[in-house]
Structures are given as structure tokens and as C-alpha cells.
From Swiss-Prot:
Organism of origin: Xylella fastidiosa (strain Temecula1 / ATCC 700964)
InterPro entries, per database record: Aldolase_TIM, BATS_dom, Biotin_synth/BioAB, Biotin_synthase, Elp3/MiaA/NifB-like_rSAM, rSAM
Annotated positions binding [2Fe-2S] cluster: 99, 130, 190, 262
Protein name: Biotin synthase
HAMAP family assigned: BioB (MF_01694)
Keyword DNA repair: no
Details of cofactor binding: Binds 1 [4Fe-4S] cluster. The cluster is coordinated with 3 cysteines and an exchangeable S-adenosyl-L-methionine. Binds 1 [2Fe-2S] cluster. The cluster is coordinated with 3 cysteines and 1 arginine.
Domain of life: Bacteria
One Gene Ontology term of the molecular function aspect: iron ion binding
Amino acid sequence: MSSIIRYDWTAEELHALFDLSLPELLYRAASVHRQHFDPAEIQVSTLLSVKTGGCPEDCSYCPQAQRYDTGVTAQKLMDVDAVVAKARQAKLAGASRFCMGAAWRSPKDRDIPKIASMIREVKALGLETCATLGMLNTCQAQALKDAGLDYYNHNVDTSPDFYDSVIHTRQYQDRLDTLAHVRDVGLKTCCGGIVGMGETRQHRVGLLLTLATLPAHPDSVPVNLLVQVAGTPLHGTQTLDPFEFVRMIAVARITMPRSMVRLSAGRESMSDELQLLCFMAGANSIFYGEKLLTTANPETERDQALFQRLGLRPMHLMENVSNKDQHHGNVHADIACKHVV
């Protein structure tokens, strides 16, 4: 199957891919994947919550929204020294990229200098940096860029026509605007969504269509499987068929051939066999560590054992070729789990 980078995908084309038999879809996705990546290499990332809970938004899936009784206690923004200590520990464990997340609608201008200090201090350790802080304006994005930030994560979450069923406090266009601000200042983008929220296949097609027709494909595409947290409105939602999740990964790989397709939240509930199918479908990135912000993640020992069983190895450094060729020569580096052979 051709791996030409396209930005003109149609909903009809994506539906046709989803409708293929699963073996045929896996074959096509794997063929595209092998044209750009080593199928035995998996990028492994880590994430630290630098400001937990108390978010004013109403995202129906999120345990950090202050309006939901989920047992998450709001905390202040961490001190720079504490973040640097965590980053130093990550580096000793083999990290080459350190991600910082804050439960904000958007950072206040007064918060930017402290975040910038975190970025500079982490960068000084020789680590790549990424952040997910909510909506940004151009000035804030530029300040983070000037501090040395490499990646910015801002998900669109779902399709435009399902979005209002999940979130009411932020518009879909707000998310697209933040992505534009991030791209405009030269930061690399990480953008994906969540499935298993009660959406239909049409909505999953709509999510991927949004991502695959952006002016530049995201450098990383996190695909999250809903983690149902008691107290959130989506707790009790019917679970997604695992094979439908695999189809989501495969179509993401075909439509965005050069992007890192990341298994993100929800991996704790996935069997080793399901994760293998996802890797065969083109997923080539995972989050590594026992916690993703406030939700559980597989223990590092389980991931190490899985890599050994499957003959996989962590991706250390790779040349990241942008889909619009604006990032030639940039290094796309994430955590390396050095104890896995």
C-alpha cells in the first residue's frame, strides 16, 4: 500500500479502510509502517503530572475535573526543584525525553515563567522536553519554545460532531487554534484522542479524519482507550470491542504514515495479545511507568517482560521527518528503557 503523505483523505476512504477484513487491514497497515519504521522498535515515553486536579473544565472522562467526585485532590504547581529531581531520576533510569502535564484550562501568564524554568532546568540535564498545559495563545507558545520546549501535546479528543456529547466548557475550534499556535512557533505537536466514550465508528472516523487533514500531521498521535473512573459521567459506558481499537490504530497508521502512533491511557486493561495486535497494526510508542497523570499504567516490569517475549526493543533516537518537511533533522527521542534487551 502506498505510503505517500496525504492531507486530502475523505470520510469515505476511511470508512472503506475500517470495513476491510481485519487481516487485510493489518496487512496494509503493517506494510505502510515498515516503509517508515523498524517494526521491532517501540518508542517509550514517560509523563509527570506537575499540577494535579482542580481543573475547571467538564470533560466527561476526566478525574481531574473539580466538579466530579473522583477522589483526586487538587494540588498546586510543583516546585521547580521537585520536577528537576523527578527528571533526574528519569534520566538515571534511561530517559531521554521528559513530559510535564498540568490540569489547567490554560496556563495563566503568571505561571509561564515557572513552567519555563522547569523546561530550562530539565533541558540542562540533557533531556528532551514536552508539555501538556491546556490551551495556549501564541505568546505563551513562543515563551515555551524560547525556554527550550520540544513538543506540545493538545488532543482534539474526538470527532467534531461527537465533541459536544463529552465537553461543554471548551470549543473544538479552541483546540485547533492551540495546535495552530504551537505549529506557528515551530514546536512539534502531539495530538490524538480517546475512544470508547460511547461514540460510533462514524465518530472514530471523524477523529482520524480531523488529524489526517491537519496542515501537518501530528508528530505523535496518542490513541487513548477510555479509563472509566468512578464519579465521572462516562463511568459505566459500554466498553469498546478490542478489535475495533486495533482497527483504530491501523487506520491511524495508514493515514499518518510518519507519525508516532502511541498506545496511551487504557493500556493497563489490555492483554499482552491485544497490545501485540496493536503493534502489528502500526502502534510504535507507549507510555512507560506506573501512572499516567492520575490513572494506572502497566508496571515497568510487565512492559520489560512483554518486550522480551515479543523480541521488541526500545527506540532510543530517530530522525523525525515532518509530514510537511518543516522539521528535517529534528531528533524525536523518548525514554529508553535501558534494562530491556
